[in-house]
Amino acid sequence: MTKTKQEIYNKRPTSPHLTIYKPQISSTLSILYRMTGVALFFAVSILVWWLILSKYDNNYLQLAECCIIKICLVAVSYAWFYHLCNGIRHLFWDIGYGFSIKLVNITGWCVVVGSVLLTVLLWV
């Protein structure tokens, strides 16, 4: 007995949906690494534009005193430190070190704690 294409298609296994997976530190940090890379592209572009404008008009420089701008600068610096720390982690992976589950989890938490500490050290 021959099966039609539709019957074969209906019996194909489907991939599990993302909602059934428990988020792990490695997957969460991987997604955040990509997100911070994109966010930093735009943030640094805006920051450079702002610095160029502040050279010609001091009003732009005075914006740095605004609380919202300071919060944004802290967030950008955290994203930068996070991206830096996770990039160093990826460099170790590139040379073949740190692929055990235990080391992946330890280095993941080191990235999170390290980026927070570096941000605090910068702004305090």
From Swiss-Prot:
Where is this protein chiefly located? membrane
Give an example GO molecular function: metal ion binding
Q: Name one GO cellular component term.
A: plasma membrane
The protein's UniProt keywords, in alphabetical order, are: Cell inner membrane, Cell membrane, Electron transport, Heme, Iron, Membrane, Metal-binding, Transmembrane, Transmembrane helix, Transport, Tricarboxylic acid cycle
Q: List the disulfide bonds.
A: none
Looking up PROSITE patterns in the UniProt record yields:
SDH_CYT_2 (PS01001)
CDD domains the UniProt entry points to? SQR_TypeC_SdhC
* Segments passing through the bilayer: 30-55, 68-88, 104-124
The stretches that face the Cytoplasmic side, renumbered to this chain, are 1-29, 89-103
Q: Tell me its cofactors.
A: heme
Identify the domain of life: Bacteria
Please give the pathway this protein is involved in: Carbohydrate metabolism; tricarboxylic acid cycle
GO terms of biological process kind: tricarboxylic acid cycle
Where does it reside?
Answer: Cell inner membrane
For this protein, the record's InterPro entries field holds: SQR/QFR_C/D, Succ_DH_cyt_bsu_CS, Succ_DH_cytb556, SuccDH_FuR_B_TM-su
As for what it does, the entry says: Membrane-anchoring subunit of succinate dehydrogenase (SDH).
* Quaternary state and interactors: Part of an enzyme complex containing four subunits: a flavoprotein, an iron-sulfur protein, plus two membrane-anchoring proteins, SdhC and SdhD. The complex can form homotrimers.
Q: Which family does it belong to?
A: Belongs to the cytochrome b560 family.
Q: What is this protein called?
A: Succinate dehydrogenase cytochrome b556 subunit
Q: Which organism is it from?
A: Rickettsia conorii (strain ATCC VR-613 / Malish 7)
Q: What is the lineage of its organism?
A: Bacteria, Pseudomonadati, Pseudomonadota, Alphaproteobacteria, Rickettsiales
Instruction: Report which gene this protein is encoded by.
Output: sdhC
